[in-house]
Amino acid sequence: DWYYLHMFHKKQPDLNWENPKLREEIYKMMNWWLDKGIAGFRVDAIMNIKKPLPFQDYPADREDGLCNVGGILGSQEGLRDFLNEMHEKTTKPHHAFSVGEVFGLDDSDISRFIGDDAYFTSIFDFRQNVAGQTMLGWYDWKVPTPDEYKECCFTSQKVSEGVGFFSNIIENHDEPRGVSHYLPEYAQNEKGKKLLGMMYFMLKGLPFIYQGQELGMANCAFPSIEAIDDVSSRDEYQRCLKVGLNEKEALKVVSHYSRDNGRTPFQWNDEKNGGFTTGTPWLMVNPQYKVGGQ
């Protein structure tokens, strides 16, 4: 039998970064694009490329007897060598911009990750996005309060001072819509949405705008789990059921945190399917928005 490691979907096998020939092929591809004139890269899931070897079993941290795969990424040695090598062989000689999707970084290490001669030009600030999360699953997560959100913003501004700048986000393709996640229900209106947008635009750093934010997009009201395509959402739905939530409660939890909230077809106008397609879209169109009538 043959096996391969995948930290995400089974159709997304992890590459073996321990192989220097593989790393050189990656750098070759990056430089090909940089030579074409692109300005830089958004580097996804980069903290996942280094795993402690040899592979071993880890203690269960959930009721199903399994453990969160992220547990193997805690204190692996050698990650910085890979990141520095990539920087030296690709973005640095091209004077290119790079922004890293970096989770779990200790504040004392920020100077190694952002700056003129760091691994990346900037990294995304996920401090407020992960606030309230636990390893148990979405059913155990807590939505950050306005005061907690403010504290996250203040902390990030302080730790980056004199070092470099973060790339600030409210949402992206892996997050629920920010207006539904961060704003209290009474503030989920036009004024509240504009205030949230203005606030992160006024922070020091580089604001990344995700499609739909210009409309003040909110979460989609998914009628059933069948309307959700995201594999992690479906997994979390089953986990909710296993810990005792009923189907209605499980759907409520998953509908709030699902990545599909940010992946519904974009509404270009007020025609069928928002003008996104004349066919059948892979996800339902959020019924709250019809751009032609906004």
Question: In which residue ranges do the predicted regions lie?
Answer:
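Active-site and adjacent substrate-binding regions of carbohydrate-active enzymes
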Residues: 1-294
